C-alpha cells in the first residue's frame, strides 16, 4: 500500500520537476536531504518526537533547507511533514529515480565482482544487457569479495548469477544429495 503512495508522491514531484526543467537538480537535492536526515540523529529525533508539533517541525525544515534546495522541493518536504511521511523520503527518492529511468528508456544493472571490471568487460556487459533489455544500461558496480570469483548481475527482478560462491554451494548440495 505504501509503495503506491510513494510512487504517487514521486510522480507528482517528478512532473513538477519536468515542467521546470529541473529533474536532475531535484534528484540531486532530494539525495542531499535524504543523506542529511539519515546522518543526523538530531533531525531524526525531532521528526520522531511526538511532543514536537507539525508546525514546529515545518519551521525547523524551512530554516534548514530554505537556501539549500529549490522552493518546490521545500514545499514537497513540508507536505510530507504535514502528512507524517517525511521519514519515508528515501522511498520517494527511489521511486522518483525509477520514474526517471523509465521516462528516459534506461534501466539499472547492479553488478558484483571480486575485482573491478576492465573497461572492455564493462562495455561488453553494457552492450549485451542493452541488447537484451532494449534500454540504455546504467551500470552500478560493487566489489564483493564474498562471491570468490565470477560475476553477479541484477537487472530489475532478473538475476544472472555466475559467481564461484554459488557454484560451490550448488556442488555441495549435489554431493550431499548423493550421500
UniProtKB/Swiss-Prot annotation:
Per the record, what is one GO cellular component?
plasma membrane
Organism listed in the record: Clostridium botulinum (strain Okra / Type B1)
Q: Does the keyword Membrane apply?
A: yes
Question: This protein is called what?
Answer: ATP synthase subunit delta
The similarity comment for this entry is: Belongs to the ATPase delta chain family.
Q: Where is the signal peptide?
A: none
What does the record note on quaternary structure? F-type ATPases have 2 components, F(1) - the catalytic core - and F(0) - the membrane proton channel. F(1) has five subunits: alpha(3), beta(3), gamma(1), delta(1), epsilon(1). F(0) has three main subunits: a(1), b(2) and c(10-14). The alpha and beta chains form an alternating ring which encloses part of the gamma chain. F(1) is attached to F(0) by a central stalk formed by the gamma and epsilon chains, while a peripheral stalk is formed by the delta and b chains.
What gene is this protein a product of?
A: atpH
What is the protein's known function? F(1)F(0) ATP synthase produces ATP from ADP in the presence of a proton or sodium gradient. F-type ATPases consist of two structural domains, F(1) containing the extramembraneous catalytic core and F(0) containing the membrane proton channel, linked together by a central stalk and a peripheral stalk. During catalysis, ATP synthesis in the catalytic domain of F(1) is coupled via a rotary mechanism of the central stalk subunits to proton translocation. This protein is part of the stalk that links CF(0) to CF(1). It either transmits conformational changes from CF(0) to CF(1) or is implicated in proton conduction.
Tell me the compartments it is located in.
Answer: Cell membrane
Highest taxon above the source species? Bacteria
List the taxonomic lineage.
Bacteria, Bacillati, Bacillota, Clostridia, Eubacteriales
Pfam families annotated for this entry? OSCP
Q: How does it sit in the membrane?
A: Peripheral membrane protein
**Keywords of this entry:** ATP synthesis, Cell membrane, CF(1), Hydrogen ion transport, Ion transport, Membrane, Transport
Output one GO MF annotation: proton-transporting ATP synthase activity, rotational mechanism
Which PANTHER family does the entry mention? ATP SYNTHASE DELTA CHAIN (PTHR11910)
Q: Which InterPro entries match?
A: ATP_synth_OSCP/delta_N_sf, ATPase_OSCP/d_CS, ATPase_OSCP/dsu
Keyword Membrane included in the entry's annotation:
yes
Amino acid at each position: 500500500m505504501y509503495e503506491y503512495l510513494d510512487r504517487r508522491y514521486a510522480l507528482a514531484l517528478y512532473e513538477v520537476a519536468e515542467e521546470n526543467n529541473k529533474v536532475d537538480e531535484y534528484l540531486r537535492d532530494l539525495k542531499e536531504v535524504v543523506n542529511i536526515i539519515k546522518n543526523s540523529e538530531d533531525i531524526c529525533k525531532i521528526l520522531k518526537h511526538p511532543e514536537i508539533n507539525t508546525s514546529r517541525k515545518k519551521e525547523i525544515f524551512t530554516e534548514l533547507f530554505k537556501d539549500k534546495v529549490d522552493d518546490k522541493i521545500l514545499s514537497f518536504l513540508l507536505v510530507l511533514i504535514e502528512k507524517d511521511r517525511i521519514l519515508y523520503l528515501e522511498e520517494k527518492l527511489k521511486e522518483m529515480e525509477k520514474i526517471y529511468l523509465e521516462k528516459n528508456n534506461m534501466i539499472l544493472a547492479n553488478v558484483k565482482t571480486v575485482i573491478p571490471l576492465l573497461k572492455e568487460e564493462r562495455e561488453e556487459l553494457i552492450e549485451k544487457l542493452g541488447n537484451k533489455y532494449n534500454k540504455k544500461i546504467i551500470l552500478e558496480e560493487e566489489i564483493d569479495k564474498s562471491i570468490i570469483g565470477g560475476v553477479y548481475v541484477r537487472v530489475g527482478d532478473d538475476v544472472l548469477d555466475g559467481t564461484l560462491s554459488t557454484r560451490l554451494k550448488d556442488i555441495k548440495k549435489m554431493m550431499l544429495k548423493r550421500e
